[in-house]
Amino acid sequence: MFESKINPLWQSFILAVQEEVKPALGCTEPISLALAAAAAAAELDGTVERIDAWVSPNLMKNGMGVTVPGTGMVGLPIAAALGALGGDAKAGLEVLKDASAKAVADAKAMLAAGHVAVMLQEPCNDILFSRAKVYSGDSWACVTIVGDHTNIVRIETDKGVVFTQADNAQEEEKNSPLGVLSHTSLEEILAFVNAVPFDAIRFILDAARLNGALSQEGLRGSWGLHIGSTLAKQCDRGLLAKDLSTAILIRTSAASDARMGGATLPAMSNSGSGNQGITATVPVMVVAEHVGADDERLARALMLSHLSAIYIHYQLPRLSALCAATTAAMGAAAGMAWLIDGRYDTIAMAISSMIGDVSGMICDGASNSCAMKVSTSASAAWKAVLMALDDTAVTGNEGIVAHNVEQSIANLCSLACRSMQQTDKQIIEIMASKAH
């Protein structure tokens, strides 16, 4: 089929997107713990009666304040309990998609009885770490996830070790389709998007379907901070213009509202995050509708957005003090700019302006307020595109922005990888003090 006509670099790009753009039900950090609990429960014959769990500081940060779908409750304990009692260990990031009302009730009862404990893993050298140990009578099972939200590295029961992943991280990185991102460029990504056969990337339209449905749900309900529906009301009151800029803001916010507020609809994630997937998708969809783009043009714009976002995020830690909605919005800026005029220079200028604008936004854990940051990032992306269309951008004479967009990206990512590590520790310390 078309695969035989695609050069190896392009095939790697496609595999990278398929690896990083996946459906996910619920915020992915608590879902990672839910998956560990579900996988552990699957090793037992009896009903789970008690759960002990341990997570990394970053996973604790991103799990403390977010609503778990279908429960109306926030936090890691309910995620662990529902994963153990109603999760599907084979469903990955959609582990809770088939959880029944009875499972939700049983999970809440387990919490009320004080039978769920979630603790910090100390010491912990892994940014993303979740471990769930579940008990049934005299039997127990323990599952550990490290490095990626679904990467199970060890399964152990009271009868012995069932599975352990060999410590071959370097070999895995070498074989990963993401490895190509360390020696490519935005120009090569744009060349791929312009020329790859449509059938090879048609799958990315699922991102528009899933995240578009979340956006509609967010506008219908009072999810989270209901930013999208609130701003829509202000349009009706004449306080906001009903224009393209506002549509980007409202529809993107609404999807994140529903996502963070616990709607039982999956998001198409990017780089392990539903909000990043929403940010890379919805602004591009709105502009595509505005310009009357057909499915092929929308797919190419979405592929550019998602792959650019992955390319930038690949240079970051999986979780950090930098709000990655900003880097996902840089992908959206690329996709929107491509839809308007398709020039590389416009795309590069838009991303440079984004780095000069929202690069200092911190991640202080997953919560309803993520929708605020998603809306800010989406608006900044469109502003940067409008400037670039007039050949205006933040230049290499200003701040951390360099004369070359690739160096600008590297400068931003170096902040997250180095100096913002202390920021992350301070954020976690502040959040932990609130929990006591």
Curated annotation (Swiss-Prot):
One of its GO terms (molecular function) is L-cysteine desulfhydrase activity. Coiled coil: none annotated. Pfam families: SDH_alpha. InterPro entries: Ser_deHydtase-like_asu, UPF0597. GO terms for biological process: L-cysteine catabolic process to pyruvate. Belongs to the UPF0597 family. PANTHER family: UPF0597 PROTEIN YHAM. This is UPF0597 protein YhaM. It comes from Salmonella paratyphi B (strain ATCC BAA-1250 / SPB7).
